């Protein structure tokens, strides 16, 4: 292993239904496991899938989950096929069957910023560089405005009117919370650019 070697660690936490398996655990124990993982690896990503119920996902979000899925398909070709029999090849059952729009609205109502950003991979903010930014708290200078911009893109392109209204209000509220004046100005300019580009595309 060389001195410049680095990697990213991410855990996908899956519960086992106690009604289906003798060694399954209850929701409270699952939440404790997630909390222990967050304390043990504070900078690692933690993904909670749609295998968990809405109630479990909401609880674990507050314990430090960093990613959740929405409108997931687990069958072969599930995203490409709309046929009713497609789910017959599902790899596992889904507990949270809400649409992506419903998931985004739910997160907004809980006060979270739904982020579709993957810029840290494209920009090389991984491994030791990511850890340096995270431990110093400077990662927020990148992630906060990027989250607002990717949310804006989603709202303009795909969201229902209800979700768009709630999300737009959250963006305006969060924009003023960006501590750096320079970053705040750039974020505001890019948010306006996103809105203008969408308007022109719809003319």
Whereabouts are the PLM-identified features?
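A short, structure-level motif marking secondary-structure boundaries and short turns
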Residues: 18-19, 40-42, 87-89, 145
């Amino acid at each position: 292993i060389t001195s410049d070697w680095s990697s990213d660690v991410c855990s996908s936490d899956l519960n086992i239904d106690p009604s289906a398996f003798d060694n399954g655990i209850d929701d409270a124990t699952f939440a404790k496991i997630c909390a222990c993982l967050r304390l043990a690896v504070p900078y690692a990503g933690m993904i909670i899938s749609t295998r968990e119920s809405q109630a479990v996902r909401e609880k674990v979000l507050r314990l430090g989950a960093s990613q959740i899925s929405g409108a997931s398909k687990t069958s072969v070709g599930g995203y490409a096929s709309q046929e009713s029999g497609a789910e017959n090849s599902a790899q596992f059952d889904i507990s949270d069957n809400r649409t992506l729009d419903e998931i985004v609205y739910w997160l907004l109502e809980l006060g979270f910023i739904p982020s579709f950003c993957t810029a840290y991979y494209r920009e090389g903010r991984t491994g030791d560089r990511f850890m340096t930014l995270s431990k110093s708290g400077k990662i927020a200078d990148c992630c906060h405005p990027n989250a607002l911009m990717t949310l804006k893109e989603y709202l303009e392109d795909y969201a229902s009117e209800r979700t768009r209204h709630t999300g737009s209000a959250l963006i305006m509220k969060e924009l003023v919370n960006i501590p750096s004046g320079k970053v705040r100005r750039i974020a505001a300019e890019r948010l306006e650019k996103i809105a203008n580009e969408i308007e022109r595309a719809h003319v």
